[in-house]
Amino acid sequence: MRVAFYAPMKSPNHPVPSGDRLMARLLIRALERAGHQVEVVSEFRTHAPTPEAAAALAPAISAEMARLREKWQKEPRPDLWFCYHPYYKSPDPFGPAIAAELAIPYVTAEASYAAKRDRTDWAGRQKRVGEAVMQAAVNISFTERDRAGLSAAFPQARLAALKPFIDSALFEAVRPAPDPSRLMTVAMMRAGDKMESYAMLAKALRLIENKPWTLSVIGDGPMHREVEGLFAGFPGRIEWLGERSETEIAGLLARGGIYVWPGCGEAYGLAYLEAQAAGLPVVAQKTAGVPAVVEAGVTGLLTPEGNVAAYAGAIAALLGDGQKREAMGQAARRFVLEERSLATAARVLDEILRKAQEQE
C-alpha cells in the first residue's frame, strides 16, 4: 500500500531527538519492512502551547490543506492515511478530510483523548481528535492504558493493539559486557517529567551513597546545567556522556550493569526497551505506561509511584545480588529481541492495516 504518513506533533524529520520522533521513525521502518511505500506527506506542526497559539495557526493550516489537495490532483493517490499521535495540543487537521475526499482508510496510532479538556479552551481541538478517532478505520494503541482511555471515551471506536517496539538490530550486534556497579540512564534534559525523574533519581542515589556504584548519563538538553546540579554531591561518580548516536548508545548500554530511570509520566519509554535489548535489567516506577515495556519481576523491578525509598532500595537490591541481576539482564534481552523487535511489529502492523482496509 501507498501510505500517507503524518505526525502532527513532531515530524520524523525534526532535528531535535525525542521519543515521539523515534517512534514515528520506527513506525515508518515497520511499515516499509512490511512492504508498504511510505511518504511523510507534511512537515506541518500543529502542536501549540496555548489555545491562543493554536488559533493563530489557522491561516497556515488552510494553506497546507490546499497544498495537499493540489498534490493529489497531480500524483497517484495514497491507499491509506496514517496519523501518529494526535491529541488535543496537536490534532490532525488534514487527514480526516483528505481520507474522506479520496475514499481511503484513515488510521491513527497513539491517539490520546483526555475528557477533562472538554471543559477547557482546548475543547475545539479536543473535539477534532474525537471526530478523527471515530472516523478511523482503526486506532492503534501501544499500551492498555491508552486503549482503555479511548474505549471509555468512544465505545464505538475501532481499536487495535501494537506493543511498543524498537529496531533491535543494533543491539543484536553488540555483546553485553556489563560492569555490575555501573548504573545507566538515557534521557533528554528538559523541564517537566524528565526533570522530575532526574530529581527523583538523584534523591534515591543519596540514600545509597554507601553502595558501590557509578552513574553514566546519556542525553542533553536545555536543562543540562540544572540536571548536573542535582548530582553535584557525587564527586567522581557521575559520567556525563552527552547526546550520542543510536550506534554509540547501543555500545555504551552494553557496558552497563543496571538501567535506572524512574519514568515519571512516561507514555511508555522506548529507552527501557533499548536498555533491555543491551542486556540490562531495569529499575523504574510502576507508573503511566512503564509496565507496557518492563516485565515486573522478570526483566526489572518496578516500585510504587513517588516512593523514593522504595526506588533506592530496588537499585540497592540489584547491586547486591549478582545472580538476580544477571538473570534479569538475560531475560530482558530475550524479551526485547524475541517479542519487541521491528520484525514482530511489522507483522502485527501489517495485519492490522490490511484488516482495516478490508473492512472499509
Give residue ranges: language-model regions.
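Aromatic "clamp/platform" in nucleotide-sugar-dependent glycosyltransferases that forms part
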Residues: C264
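Short hydrophobic beta-strand element within catalytic cores of glycosyltransferases
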Residues: P281-A284, V294
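Conserved acidic donor-binding segment of nucleotide-sugar-dependent glycosyltransferases
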Residues: A296-G297, L301-V308, A317-Q323
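Membrane-proximal helix-turn-helix segments that form the acceptor-binding/catalytic region
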Residues: W122-N139
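Conserved donor-binding/catalytic core segment of Leloir-type glycosyltransferases
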Residues: R175-E196, A202-R206, S216
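Carbohydrate-associated surface elements
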Residues: R145, F165
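Short alpha-helical donor nucleotide-sugar binding micro-motif in glycosyltransferases
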Residues: E243-R244, G251-G256
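Nucleotide-activated donor-binding/catalytic signature segment of Leloir-type glycosyltransferases, i.e.
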Residues: R225-T247
